[in-house]
């Protein structure tokens, strides 16, 4: 009888432990989902509001045509429309990737050319924040088989991340070198860094480093998750080296064989 009681007690305790674990997991997933929805709402609302204000200015008959600065207004609408499109595409690409329907088209390309193109697209943004981007292209052989679109996107995400977490004026370094029959590409910043407890989760889908304000740093928490998946699709690897309040360095290795 005692043995049966012990077994029953053990079953009850295990059942309680499993139920509690499931409840905590569901609560965590619910919190992540709510954070994602809040961030997505904020990210989509901002460009929509800006476009709305710009169009109201165009329709406002009380403002003289000469004072409206039409070229500036049209540029704002164009920029915000592009921003809105990129945000929507980012969510859709993640959904397609998770469904397993995304196709990778490998081509032999010079990665230095792609990296240079992406870096140039950030020059104005970084200069407007009184920052700088340095390039150290040390790889003697920068040719590898990659998907041009996705490799461009993953580089864009890494640089975008470096700018977002710059904590003031961005100081970013992009470097390449040949390493173990591959090309090592590093994006390094002098930003806020990442705490040890967050580093293991940094590549999780929807995960965003807490900065005290949920809207302090824009984004859905999809960027680094996408980067990791795409590096793995290229049979490569990614590593994070970070020190809190001192900056982060992301290193990816793309094989060349």
Language model region names:
Residues 79-84:
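Short alpha-helical segment of the dimerization/phosphotransfer core of two-component systems
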Residues 99-104, 143-146:
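Conserved micro-motifs of the catalytic ATP-binding
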Residues 105-110, 127, 132-142:
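Conserved catalytic submotifs in the C-terminal HATPase_c
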Residues 162-163:
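Short helix-loop "hinge" at the ATP-lid/N-box region of the Bergerat-fold HATPase_c
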Residues 169-181:
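Short beta-strand/loop element within the Bergerat-fold HATPase_c
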Residues 194-208:
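Short conserved segment of the HATPase_c
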Residues 231-232:
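Detector for a conserved hydrophobic position within an alpha-helical segment of the HATPase_c
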Residues 235-237:
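Conserved glycine-rich
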């Amino acid at each position: 009888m005692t043995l049966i009681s012990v077994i029953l007690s053990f079953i009850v305790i295990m059942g309680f432990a499993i139920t509690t674990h499931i409840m905590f997991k569901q609560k965590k997933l619910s919190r992540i989902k709510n954070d994602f929805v809040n961030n997505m709402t904020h990210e989509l609302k901002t460009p929509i509001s800006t476009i709305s204000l710009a169009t109201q200015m165009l329709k406002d008959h009380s403002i003289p045509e000469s004072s409206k600065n039409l070229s500036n207004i049209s540029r704002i609408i164009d920029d915000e429309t592009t921003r809105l499109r990129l945000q929507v595409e980012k969510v859709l690409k993640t959904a397609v990737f998770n469904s397993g329907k995304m196709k990778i088209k490998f081509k032999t390309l010079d990665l230095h050319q792609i990296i240079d193109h992406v870096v140039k697209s950030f020059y104005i943004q970084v200069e407007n924040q009184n920052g700088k981007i340095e390039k150290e292209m040390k790889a003697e052989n920068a040719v590898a088989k990659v998907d041009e679109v996705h490799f461009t996107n993953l580089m864009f995400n890494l640089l975008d991340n470096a700018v977002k977490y710059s904590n003031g004026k961005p100081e970013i370094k992009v470097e390449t070198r040949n390493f173990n029959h591959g090309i090592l590409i590093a994006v390094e910043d002098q930003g806020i860094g990442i705490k040890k407890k967050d580093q293991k989760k940094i590549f999780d889908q929807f995960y965003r480093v807490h900065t005290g304000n949920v809207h302090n740093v824009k984004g859905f928490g999809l960027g680094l998750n996408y980067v990791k998946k795409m590096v793995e699709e290229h049979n490569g690897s990614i590593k994070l080296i970070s020190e809190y309040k001192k900056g982060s360095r992301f290193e990816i290795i793309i094989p060349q064989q």
